[in-house]
Each structure stands twice: as structure tokens, then as C-alpha cells.
From Swiss-Prot:
Name of protein: UPF0231 protein NT01EI_0766
Signal sequence bounds: none
Disulfide cysteine pairs (residue numbers): none
Family: Belongs to the UPF0231 family.
Stretches assigned to coiled coil: none
Transmembrane segments: none
Biological source species: Edwardsiella ictaluri (strain 93-146)
Length: 120
């Protein structure tokens, strides 16, 4: 998973992610928006999941985050449509709206995101 953090013209932190993980970047840009308290909450929930079978989710305005003890899924809330209903052009959009990654990789992203915000 390749990614970078930048500032836009207004000074807002923007996260850009490689193909297959774009939804993680969209989630950071749309739902987190530099909220360090939210990052801390997510990190605490992830720590509580270790070694358990439990899952945790955080539903936002545009994206929902799901965590379990090993994996993370970020999914656009508008993906409630059945995939059979999507034409080929929409399947590409669908792929940009769903990302899966390992929990440890995701937590590393959050750590680097926090560091970028605090340093700039």
C-alpha cells in the first residue's frame, strides 16, 4: 500500500493512496480531516480487538470503517447497491470505494498521518 500526505491550497492535509487502497485515502480526507482525537479512539478500539473475535465499526457520513483483530475494511456508504446492478463503468468506481488491508498496516498509516499533521 503506497501513500503520501500533502497539504492543499487551504492548508488541509490530503491523503493520496495507491490503486486498491484509494478508499482509505478518501476516508482520511472525508471522515478524519485531521481529527487526532478520532485517531486515538480508533487506535484504542483496535488495541481492544487484539486476540478477540469481536469486530468494531465506525460509520461516517461518506465512509464506514470496519476493524477486527487482523483486518480493516473501508467502504463507501453508498455501496449498498447490489454489484449485479452496476454496469462496467460503475465497477471501476466501486473498486475505488472499497479497500481492505491488514490491521497493523492500517495502524501504521494512522501513526504516519498523525506525525505529518503534528510536524506541519
Amino acid at each position: 500500500m503506497d501513500y503520501e500526505f500533502r497539504h492543499d491550497i487551504g492548508g488541509q492535509v490530503i491523503a493520496l493512496f495507491s490503486m486498491g487502497h484509494e478508499a482509505v485515502g478518501h476516508w482520511l480526507n472525508e471522515e478524519v480531516k485531521g481529527d487526532l482525537a478520532l485517531l486515538s479512539r480508533i487506535e484504542q478500539e483496535a488495541a481492544a480487538l487484539k486476540g478477540s473475535e469481536r469486530q468494531w465499526q465506525l460509520e461516517g457520513h461518506e465512509y464506514t470503517l470496519w476493524l477486527d483483530s487482523e483486518e480493516v475494511m473501508v467502504r463507501a456508504n453508498q455501496l449498498a447497491l447490489e454489484s449485479d446492478e452496476l454496469d462496467d463503468g460503475m465497477r471501476y468506481y466501486d473498486e475505488e470505494s472499497l479497500s481492505l488491508c491488514g490491521l497493523e498496516d492500517f495502524l501504521q498509516v494512522l501513526t504516519r498521518y498523525r506525525s505529518f499533521i503534528q510536524q506541519h
